[in-house]
Amino acid sequence: MTYVDVKGEVVSSGSEWIYSWYGIQAVSPSIIQKALNNANGQPITVRINSGGGDVFAGCEIYNMLKNHNGDVSIEIHGLCASIASVIAMAGKCKMSPLAEIMIHNVSTKAQGDYRDMEHTAEVLKKANKTISNAYTLKTGM
């Protein structure tokens, strides 16, 4: 059995190094891919305690887990918030009675004129619709 930790910030593979350099716990698609390669199609258990992070990195991790040839078990040990909750939808879930899951609309910070704000709003709406597919697939609702 291979254990994979999704702890700390979910970050892109390209920015993972800065978190590592500062000693800040983070997970990226490249970390998950290495673990999946090492699992070689065998069952894996993903242990989650994360407040979330980068939506696109999280979606990439979700897709990697869904495409894994072996069974994927999810254990939620603490906080499972934001994009981490989407990652949790990629396998069979068990949740500690002391754990929490938090789901919310996609958010960002933006600046610019009204055109920039309208564009940002459209990007957020599309991202909301995209990630809601993971919840729908998992729950059938």
What does each model-found stretch correspond to?
Residues 1-141:
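Terminal-region recognition feature
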